Amino acid sequence: MAESFFSDFGLLWYLEELKKEEFWKFKELLKQEPLKLKLKPIPWTELKKASRENVSKLLSKHYPGKLAWDVTLNLFLQISRDDLWRKARNEIRQKINPYRSHMKQKFQVLWEKEPCLLVPEDFYEETTKIEYELLSTVYLDAFKPGESSPTVVLHGPEGIGKTTFLRKVMLEWAKGNLWRDRFSFVFFLTGREMNGVTDMSLVELLSRDWPESSEPIEDIFSQPERILFILDGMEELKFDLDCNADLCEDWEQPQSMQVVLQSLLQKQMLPECSLLLALSKMGMRKNYSLLKHMKCIFLLGFSEHQRKLYFSHYFQEKDASSRAFSFVREKSSLFVLCQSPFLCWLVCTSLKCQLEKGEDLELDSETITGLYVSFFTKVFRSGSETCPLKQRRARLKSLCTLAAEGMWTCTFLFCPEDLRRNGVSESDTSMWLDMKLLHRSGDCLAFIHTCIQEFCAAMFYMFTRPKDPPHSVIGNVTQLITRAVSGHYSRLSWTAVFLFVFSTERMTHRLETSFGFPLSKEIKQEITQSLDTLSQCDPNNVMMSFQALFNCLFETQDPEFVAQVVNFFKDIDIYIGTKEELIICAACLRHCHSLQKFHLCMEHVFPDESGCISNTIEKLTLWRDVCSAFAASEDFEILNLDNCRFDEPSLAVLCRTLSQPVCKLRKFVCNFASNLANSLELFKVILHNPHLKHLNFYGSSLSHMDARQLCEALKHPMCNIEELMLGKCDITGEACEDIASVLVHNKKLNLLSLCENALKDDGVLVLCEALKNPDCALEALLLSHCCFSSAACDHLSQVLLYNRSLTFLDLGSNVLKDEGVTTLCESLKHPSCNLQELWLMNCYFTSVCCVDIATVLIHSEKLKTLKLGNNKIYDAGAKQLCKALKHPKCKLENLGLEACELSPASCEDLASALTTCKSLTCVNLEWITLDYDGAAVLCEALVSLECSLQLLGLNKSSYDEEIKMMLTQVEEMNPNLIISHHLWTDDEGRRRGILV
């Protein structure tokens, strides 16, 4: 059954309350009602003559558990027996659900032991009233026929109270105060819990906390839309979630927790169920792409008034509360931090230690780390006063070793064996519990908050010595730094942040003074050596997270340290999405003097929508600091602004920096830029820079006026642009007159990409007139996806005859058809045509024009690369091309035949061409259909000494094991040959300006 109370009273009792005519009408309606619920109807032959008792049995048989009652209650309303409907509903609600009762008991205990709450329940409810009301309705709004169940994300920074709020929500559901008619079952899963589980099905996972007195757990899945999963602690998972991972639909099939969780999140398993999960900023960025039908609720924390009330609840004594709050209120940075309930508790606990000792109130509020240090040292000193110094040091080292081991193994619940292994005795445990650094969680112990565990894990390294043997689980400083700043969203990020701060001379001295014993002095040197080594690694092998690195550096508040580290790196890639991230980035880059390449994605910063002038001025000042790095280095060459949104003032700051004589920018990329408010000034500045050779505006919308202003700048004598990428810029044929003028007047421009712009035939005609002009020096023109037809080929073919400089032409993804390609071939085979590379992928031609293409291959000694992929060439066309390849006059080096619908029958012709054509070094055959015989013929040619091929485009993984083995053996036997998937994808993207 879906809920146990259905066994306590029968359908029969209610059916016997129906009059004869009502019962007959009930049965007639029962023929159709199940269809509305997408259920199979009961056969009328069984139903027609069934008695009340038999109807109740049929309902229970065909619609087990709650389904039978859903059908019955709906029919009571339709036969106007609202009284029975109300009676049944009330009786159902009064019955006890063993699972709900079990959860009520469990979460009531958790709530009462909530370690950092320490406030009356009504006060807590007031602080989360807005979020609670939003959450109580968000699933009700979505519960409509045909609508997908939502994934609701409770979003907020660490310490804002997400876990506490979710536990409260679970308790309110269990009490019957929340979603009473919406969710029959709510399951609370934590990252910590899933870390301790090996392969297991979803139903097995849920069974671990399923009361024995309840109905079989498998029955609850008959109505998945009545199920909610609450997921907490996603950042604590020891495994990563991957968009491309294999998913599972079967909730009874044992799988890894990674697959089970990911299948739930991506709605592959139980797609009708609802999800509620808590994510921090890091978790949001990491898991955003996985979530379906997402709705966000932001947890706001304490208002100013609520912060004051919290102090009064915490201290209880009015004088202490007033003194503590006045101290915090006078320190604006500290008062802001107290918006977070956990940090507010941290502050109050620290101040309480001082008040109890009669000390002057003092807290470091410059940084988060400073606040944690204040808290930790004060509670440690208060709680360990009676301990001898040596024992105090040993106890702290054991605690920090436990924390570090947990961080490296993703362990957040520690059993007695974990404590013993790390030297934490029972008396130690009592001390840490009294200090509220640890708290009990069932039979295990946990740090009072993950941030405290991260803090202690960083402290572990301050106890190490150079000659200490390596720990079996805990990585050394170099490994920690590498893990934290290479790649994205490392679980060790905050441990690294704390360690950076601890390593500074100022903080090391402060810790030693507070603890009363010496700490390691070598950490800072180890950190800098690690980062220096990382800076010299190949970026293709080590992906740096400069967000993580800059967070670490900013937290140190040590300009010399920041300058030393940031100048190790010549190539920086950063994302700025908030004012806080802008502050951190500016604080680091203002010390950067050796930058060579800079990649920036900046959104949600400009324009400033706060309406506050001082906020706008502050942002512009910070942005100026970021831009200062472009002019501070004589070696700065490449600026890549990717998906950046500007307003006029922020663009002006950028322009002023780039116009400085010391700026020697060589390559400027501004892809998918929004709101280029003052593009004329930008064009003037960047194009009058004598060092600038490459300009790329791919994906940035340019109006007709923008395009005209850009072209005017391009014609200026000081302009030295050689490569211009204007793909996907919303340029139309109307702007082609201005572009054509540039082609005639600018002798330095040798490459132009206009891909993905609707130029159409008229626009191409205008360009062709300029290309035929003797003054045009263009060498490469890319016109893929430009919406022109075979009619344009007449003009393009004339360009091929008259233009002496053009060697590369991309016409891909335009509807040229056979007639268009045939027209081009007439010029291609002419001796005066200088074209060396032609791209005709996806141009809608067939094998009909392959005779003309074959003629070109024989007569053109200059054409070296021909890409014909994604056209219906078939085996007949391939035969014509292979015949030409075998001709002694053929000089072709690269041929693209991917996705040309070639069958195994073409392999004989291809094999013959490969062993005959000595110039051919690269062939793309992706998506060719291969059987064993065809593959064998092809492989025999590939290992032949007569074959000159060096690159072959094939996806080996798409074939069966036998063919895969043959292709692998080919690579082993022919060391000069590489077989590669997506052979040209990256190169084509770069040449079109899509990739940088």
Curated annotation (Swiss-Prot):
Binding sites annotated in the UniProt record for ATP: G156, P157, E158, G159, I160, G161, K162, T163
Domain Pyrin: 1-94
Cellular component terms per the entry's GO annotation: canonical inflammasome complex; cytoplasm
Keywords: ATP-binding, Cytoplasm, Immunity, Inflammasome, Inflammatory response, Innate immunity, Leucine-rich repeat, Nucleotide-binding, Repeat
Tissues expressed in: Detected exclusively in testis and ovary, and at high level in the oocyte from antral follicles.
Annotated localization: Cytoplasm; Inflammasome
LRR repeats (start-end): 748-769, 777-798, 805-825, 834-855, 862-883, 891-914
InterPro entries, per database record: DAPIN, DEATH-like_dom_sf, Leu-rich_rpt, LRR_dom_sf, NACHT_NTPase, NLRP_HD2, NLRP_innate_immun_reg, NOD1/2_WH
Residues of the NACHT domain: 150-469
Alphabetical GO biological process terms: inflammatory response; innate immune response; regulation of inflammatory response
Gene Ontology molecular functions: ATP binding
Family statement drawn from the similarity comment of this UniProt entry: Belongs to the NLRP family.
Functional note: As the sensor component of the NLRP9 inflammasome, plays a crucial role in innate immunity and inflammation. In response to pathogens, including rotavirus, initiates the formation of the inflammasome polymeric complex, made of NLRP9, PYCARD and CASP1. Recruitment of proCASP1 to the inflammasome promotes its activation and CASP1-catalyzed IL1B and IL18 maturation and release in the extracellular milieu. The active cytokines stimulate inflammatory responses. Inflammasomes can also induce pyroptosis, an inflammatory form of programmed cell death.
Subunit structure: Sensor component of NLRP9 inflammasomes. Inflammasomes are supramolecular complexes that assemble in the cytosol in response to pathogens, such as rotavirus, and play critical roles in innate immunity and inflammation. The core of NLRP9 inflammasomes consists of a signal sensor component (NLRP9), an adapter (ASC/PYCARD), which recruits an effector pro-inflammatory caspase (CASP1). Within the complex, NLRP9 and PYCARD interact via their respective DAPIN/pyrin domains.
Protein name as it appears in the record: NACHT, LRR and PYD domains-containing protein 9
Record organism: Bos taurus
Taxonomic lineage from the root: Eukaryota, Metazoa, Chordata, Craniata, Vertebrata
Gene that produces this protein: NLRP9
